[in-house]
Swiss-Prot record:
This is Sphingomyelinase C. Its main location: secreted. It comes from Bacillus cereus. It is an enzyme of class 3 (hydrolase). Its cofactor is Mg(2+).
Length: 333
């Protein structure tokens, strides 16, 4: 964010000019920073090592924690921090940069949360895999578990994390979520219909929270709603997402997809022939303070190479996750 006194009246005047000029620039910079919020979301692909032991979860927890791309944000939303050990390691690695953190959604309903709402169950095999870390104090933390999922998602406490964050003299409300996955194991249940209901649960929560309309409300995470080929279709699930959340469409920059098997080594190994998808977003509520500008930029950071061994064969990758991070810049009025 990131003088010396001179002899004589003229020199003294010049010195004052320099001094006050520097203070003005400093004040302007401080004002700009106070009116800008930087929020990132990243699905970090930390599946449980009990089921998926060979995806370098602990290695990547260290690589992500040391990576430049995740630094210098105000708030970071993490998705798929399912593996207990790797997620604890990642959160620990991020603690210096982001000392204010939530627990992982759905892992427990203890006093690390101000409230636990929705359909939390301690008997559900997997947690919800969402956590939020912040540079600024988090003054309220609520976890909410969705009423319904389909396919394997039924075996996790998926939902959303709500945080009320105080940046200097203003409050910002950030919801991090990971919606229902597209899954053939859902049978006759449409994953899109489940996602719509989950979005309605988020919107109902916000409505009932009675947040002052001059405060900013942001939604972020892996929505599992594909923007590609849907932007100009008013009947698309993409359009419906914004309508349901009463959210404004951001400006998009950077890479054209957040999951891309043509450019990402992990995605390529898993699904080499699948088309690219844009699934991860940071968007703002239109029912509350409206940002003068919000941009979603897809980054493509490459990680140092990391290697795993499976059945005596070595596999080497150079990505932090199968998803790319999305960095949002929000200009607040």
């Amino acid at each position: 964010m990131k003088g010396k006194l001179l002899k004589g009246v003229l020199s003294f005047g010049i010195g004052l000019g320099v001094l006050y000029g520097g203070s003005s620039v400093q004040a302007d910079t401080s004002t700009d920073q106070n009116n800008t919020l930087k929020v990132m979301t990243h699905n970090v692909y930390m599946l449980s090592t009990n089921l998926y032991p060979n995806w370098g979860q602990s290695q990547r927890a260290d690589l992500i924690g040391a990576a430049d791309y995740i630094k210098n944000q105000d708030v970071v939303i993490l998705n798929e921090v399912f593996d207990n050990s790797a997620s604890d390691r990642l959160l620990g690695n991020l603690k210096k940069e982001y000392p204010n953190q939530t627990a992982v959604l759905g892992r427990s309903n203890g006093n690390e949360w101000d409230k636990t709402l929705g359909s939390y169950s301690s008997s559900t095999p997997e947690d919800g895999g969402v956590a939020i870390v912040s540079k600024w104090p988090i003054v309220e933390k609520i976890q909410y578990v969705f009423a319904k999922g389909c396919g394997p998602d039924n075996l996790s406490n998926k939902g959303f994390v709500y945080t009320k964050i105080k940046k200097n003299d203003r409050f910002v409300h950030v919801i991090g979520t990971h919606l229902q996955a597209e899954d053939s194991m859902c049978g006759k249940t449409s994953p899109a219909s489940v996602r719509t209901n989950q979005l309605k649960e988020i919107q109902d929560f916000i409505k009932n929270k009675n947040i002052p309309n001059d405060e900013y409300v942001l939604f972020g995470g892996d929505m599992n709603v594909n923007k590609i080929n849907a932007e100009n279709n008013s009947d698309s699930e993409y359009a419906s997402m914004f309508k349901t959340l009463h959210a404004s469409i951001p400006s998009y920059t950077g890479h054209t997809a957040t999951w891309d098997a043509t450019t990402n080594s992990i995605a390529k190994y898993n699904f080499p022939d699948s088309p690219a998808e844009y699934l991860d977003y940071i968007i703002a509520s239109k029912d509350h303070a409206n940002p003068s500008f919000i941009e979603n930029k897809v980054l493509q950071p490459k990680s140092p190479q990391w290697t795993v061994t499976s059945w005596l064969k070595k596999y080497t990758y150079d990505d932090y996750s199968d998803h790319y991070p999305v960095a949002a810049t929000i200009s607040m009025k």
